[in-house]
């Protein structure tokens, strides 16, 4: 919890906008229904117009539950699936967000807050920047972030 709080602070997310639960790590499949109920309640309370979830092909068991139960809970809401290349067999790269240098610096700083993951190659600054360059190249800009468009609702 300490790491996510620090990362959110770097991103400018107010502590009162961060909602954390105590589901045990790597055991989300056992709590699938409870997680769905939390999300349904959040949908009712917040009524978001966009929800960003792990992409539908993320193989990490906890991410997979969040992605699929999130789809069920927010099915009447626009949804994007974020990219975690080390966990995804595939991702449909259909939504791009152009990033500027300050955005990328902020992302690098936020990822550095996850000190317990610092030994992993994907948590390093070089990987984060390289992926942003790759995604930017795909759409003709310097940096970008990709999302899978799970559901897009225009009203």
Where are these regions (language model features)?
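Active-site beta-strand->loop->alpha-helix modules in alpha/beta enzyme cores, enriched
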Residues: 1-78, 127, 131-142
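Residues that form or immediately flank small-molecule/cofactor binding pockets and catalytic motifs
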Residues: 23-25, 84-86, 152
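A short acidic, often aromatic-flanked loop/helix-cap motif at beta-alpha or helix-coil junctions
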Residues: 25-29, 87-89, 103-104
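Short, surface-exposed amphipathic charged segments that create phosphate/polyanion-binding patches used
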Residues: 33-36, 94-98
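C-terminal accessory domains and tails appended to enzymatic cores
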Residues: 41, 45-46, 64, 72-82, ...
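Histidine-centered beta-alpha loop that forms part of the nucleotide-sugar donor binding/catalytic region
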Residues: 55-56, 83-85
